């Protein structure tokens, strides 16, 4: 290893250099190949990892658990209703307890400030951000690995567009990772749903060093013109009240990823990406409720069924890569 990531926290991509990020991507690819070929070696035997989930999860939980199992580590799942965190015990105290029992801690919840200044500051062991309201760093490694696998271009020449509410963890994180890796990053959203001015300014400074191209626009067609990949996410995030749906639909309807917007890219090879879960039809409880009020969205909210079920959709490859990239984080920070 050209540099040492051992015992490092993984809290946000801003904390890592481009070389460190590329190393994690290379390691992810190597570990994926080893799993597929049956030659994987275990580097985490005897390690114990705690998984704290204040928000529910399918992909993040499964990815961490399988990555740990594959590498010989043990895991303990601490769910939203299965602990004293925030009820009878502060996160600071929880960190000091778990840090004495576990070799690393994953956290998925709400506050970025809390995971950085309480959990990571007091645990004494590596802490991994499985998602907060502000950032989703493990998803970013999976997203870039997926784009790398589905493009003939060097990473720095890949272009991608994020459409939707860009103030959330996905919008913020896609802006950061692209600026770090010198990519062509486009954000298409109403202006007051853009990332904060402070984060945009920080990413533009990073882009001066890496050669990244950053575009923020309110025009969805401008955002996707010539792009290689189109990303979106749900329009209402976990923890937000249901009452915000009406306003969010009004604002974001022009940014729905449908066949017309895919075609507007002018790129017949353009791919669609989504961190999941996606409301691409009315088969889910939320989908049924929304389509009952907005019949025009019965065929999908942020993405339409025809796009999601098309060959252009690589969301499930993207989901699989959560496990390979999380495994790379674990091996590089905890491995023997």
Curated annotation (Swiss-Prot):
| Keyword Cytoplasm listed | yes
Per the UniProt record, which residue ranges are transmembrane?
none
Where found in the cell? Cytoplasm
GO function term, MF aspect, one: ornithine carbamoyltransferase activity
Give the CC-aspect GO terms.
cytoplasm
Q: Gene3D superfamilies given for it?
A: Aspartate/ornithine carbamoyltransferase
Q: Does the keyword Transmembrane apply?
A: no
Origin superkingdom: Bacteria
Its keywords, alphabetically, are: Arginine metabolism, Cytoplasm, Transferase
Q: In which pathway does it act?
A: Amino-acid degradation; L-arginine degradation via ADI pathway; carbamoyl phosphate from L-arginine: step 2/2
Where does the chain bind L-ornithine? Answer: 169, 233, 237-238
Q: Which residues bind carbamoyl phosphate?
A: 57-60, 84, 108, 136-139, 275-276, 322
Listed InterPro entries: Asp/Orn_carbamoyltranf_P-bd, Asp/Orn_carbamoylTrfase, Asp/Orn_carbamoylTrfase_sf, Asp_carbamoyltransf_Asp/Orn-bd, Orn/put_carbamltrans, OTCase_ArgI
User: What's the catalysed reaction?
Assistant: carbamoyl phosphate + L-ornithine = L-citrulline + phosphate + H(+)
Which EC number applies?
2.1.3.3
Provide the protein name: Ornithine carbamoyltransferase, catabolic
Classification from the root reads: Bacteria, Pseudomonadati, Pseudomonadota, Betaproteobacteria, Neisseriales
């Amino acid at each position: 290893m050209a540099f040492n990531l051992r015992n490092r926290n993984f809290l946000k991509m801003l904390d890592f250099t481009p070389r460190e990020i590329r190393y994690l991507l290379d390691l992810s690819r190597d570990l994926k190949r080893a799993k597929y070929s049956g030659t994987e070696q275990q580097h985490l035997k005897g390690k114990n990892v705690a998984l704290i989930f204040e928000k529910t999860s399918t992909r993040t939980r499964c990815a961490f658990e399988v990555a740990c199992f594959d590498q010989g580590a043990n895991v303990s799942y601490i769910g939203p209703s299965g602990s004293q965190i925030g009820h009878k015990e502060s996160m600071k105290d929880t960190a000091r307890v778990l840090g004495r029992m576990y070799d690393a801690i994953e956290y998925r919840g709400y506050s970025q400030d809390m995971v950085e200044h309480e959990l990571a500051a007091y645990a004494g062991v590596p802490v991994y951000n499985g998602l907060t309201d502000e950032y989703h760093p493990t998803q970013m490694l999976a997203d870039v690995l997926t784009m790398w696998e589905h493009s003939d271009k060097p990473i720095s020449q890949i272009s991608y567009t994020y459409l939707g509410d860009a103030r959330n963890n996905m919008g913020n994180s896609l802006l950061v990772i692209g600026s770090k890796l010198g990519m062509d990053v486009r954000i298409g959203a109403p202006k007051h749903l853009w990332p904060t001015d402070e984060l945009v300014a920080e990413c533009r400074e990073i882009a001066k060093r890496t050669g990244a191209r950053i575009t923020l626009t309110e025009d969805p067609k401008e955002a996707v013109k010539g792009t290689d990949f189109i990303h979106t996410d749900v329009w209402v995030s976990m923890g937000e009240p249901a009452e915000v749906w009406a306003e969010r639909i009004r604002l974001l309807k022009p940014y729905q990823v449908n066949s017309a917007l895919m075609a507007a890219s002018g790129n017949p090879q353009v791919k669609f990406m989504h961190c999941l879960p996606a409301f691409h039809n009315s088969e889910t409880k939320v989908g049924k409720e929304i389509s009952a009020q907005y019949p025009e969205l019965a065929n999908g909210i942020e993405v339409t069924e025809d796009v999601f079920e098309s060959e252009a959709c690589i969301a499930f490859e993207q989901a699989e890569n959560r496990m390979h990239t999380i495994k790379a984080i674990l091996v590089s920070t905890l491995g023997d």
